[in-house]
Amino acid sequence: MSTKIAAEEFYDKFAATYDEVLKDPSCNAQHVNEAAKIFNRHNHHQGSVLDIACGTGFLSELLEGEFDYTGIDISSKMLDYAAQRGYKTIHKPIETALAEIDSKSYDFVFCLSSLLCVEDAATAIKHINRIARKTIIISLDETTEEYMKNFVVPVYDHSKMAIENAMEDYFIMGWTSPTLGITIRTRMIYIEQKSSE
């Protein structure tokens, strides 16, 4: 078993090359493109976006329309890049940040391949449901035993958890770990919030 390090330390070191890795064919990062495809297909063109574990804010390059972005990330170095893309930033762990955000405060909430780093994903998803006014896109990674054992940051497999009210819910080949070469299947989930008017 590998020695584990904090997610913040790992992602701070990764920040400068993160965009290149996402675009690298060997990483085959399909989950972000798939999320953008789902979102664009549902004709959302403006509003506020909460991007959970936003990294460098790469998502903003893929969405078609006028959006105000806020990103949560544990890595201050990642958030520096997101800020250059116009993101408002929240530098906190996902669990802490979500608990502090007001209900119905963002139109659209994205949480892409980041809940693998959160032990209590069910509570995070409850907060996401509380925060989103219009739609939610979540991707859950099917982390393999080999990946969980060998990745330097502690990770979990939440890919089989029950998700209520999903309009779309399917698996894709999500991405290949740039450090381990392990391919991870990703469950893509699209939820439209019921209007409370």
PLM features: what roles do these ranges have?
Residues 1-43, 46-55, 144:
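Conserved class I S-adenosyl-L-methionine
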Residues 99-108:
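A short acidic, Gly/Pro-enriched loop at the edge of an enzyme's catalytic core
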Residues 108-120:
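A short SAM/SAH-binding and catalytic strip from SAM-dependent methyltransferases
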Residues 134-142:
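Conserved beta-strand signature within the Rossmann-like core of class I S-adenosyl-L-methionine
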Residues 145-162:
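Acceptor-substrate binding/catalytic loop of class I
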Residues 171-182:
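Conserved S-adenosyl-L-methionine
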